[in-house]
């Protein structure tokens, strides 16, 4: 089975509302936390979501996910708290573009 090319991952992901992010092309991405033993993962899928007004960061519920991710060298993202997230995979899953990000431990 041929693997579908998904291109480059988004350069930026900004939180729009709880669990929903926007990229630099205004596409929406839904993020879900996956906790495994001692590390945190985020499954982020590019899904069309109708957007209302953006939620103010101070009004967001407490979340383990950041307000923003920015693409960083070596297949990683840096979040607004200066934490690094490794891109575990970036592929198409049943026609949906998906990123799996793993929070790296502090050095």
Curated annotation (Swiss-Prot):
Q: Which GO terms describe its molecular function?
A: protein kinase binding; protein serine/threonine kinase activator activity
Name one process (GO BP) from the record. intracellular signal transduction
Q: Which SUPFAM superfamilies match?
A: Oncogene products (SSF50904)
Pfam families referenced in this protein's UniProt entry, alphabetically = TCL1_MTCP1
Gene3D superfamilies (UniProt xref): TCL1/MTCP1
Q: In which tissues is it expressed?
A: Not found at a significant level in any tissue.
Recorded GO CC terms: mitochondrion
Any coiled-coil regions, as ranges: none
Tell me which family the UniProt entry assigns to this protein. Belongs to the TCL1 family.
Q: How does it assemble?
A: Interacts with AKT1 and AKT2 (via PH domain). Does not interact with AKT3.
Q: What does this protein do?
A: Enhances the phosphorylation and activation of AKT1 and AKT2.
* This protein's name: Protein p13 MTCP-1
What organism is recorded for this protein?
Mus musculus
Which gene name does the record give?
Mtcp1
């Amino acid at each position: 089975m041929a693997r579908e090319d998904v291109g480059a991952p988004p350069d930026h992901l900004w939180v729009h509302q709880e669990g929903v992010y926007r990229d630099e092309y205004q596409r929406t991405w839904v993020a879900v936390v996956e906790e495994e033993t001692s590390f945190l993962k985020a499954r982020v899928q590019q899904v069309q979501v109708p957007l209302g007004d953006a939620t103010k960061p101070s009004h967001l519920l407490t979340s383990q996910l950041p307000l923003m991710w920015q693409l960083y060298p070596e297949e990683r993202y840096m979040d607004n708290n200066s934490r690094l997230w490794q891109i575990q995979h970036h592929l198409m899953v049943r026609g949906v573009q998906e990123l799996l990000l793993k929070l790296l431990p502090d050095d």
